[in-house]
């Protein structure tokens, strides 16, 4: 896996939602180390807690992002950070074809602003030498490659090296479309 998670690491899933990726991370960690699942919505974290219990994942801590203090307390603490950022969802149109009719330019503009803020803020959780994956289920370059390029040009982003990225297109793979970029924090 791109994030290269191992047992004993400190890992943060910043946009955990109902926790599919969190549970995968817990499995890779073999219940060893600290895995923090964060989300804006308490209801999603409650779902994740139930799923984690059913799956035997016991190394997960749950944190609601209700203030900036939640993020600040974690600054430079994690070996690995996953940012599965909010996005337009244009990579999953195959499963949700009506979504394209609901998307407005204002929504795309707003989501790009949210992505920039999330990347700027949550990247500070990565400790020097640690790695971050920025991911979306979008196929728009403005939400993906361009977003990463913009971040790397910021003061915070200058502390990171771009390692590699990957773009999956539904038309080529048969899977949902998505994007992932691997960044490493400079020591």
Question: What residue spans do the PLM features occupy?
Answer:
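S-adenosylmethionine
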Residues: 1-187
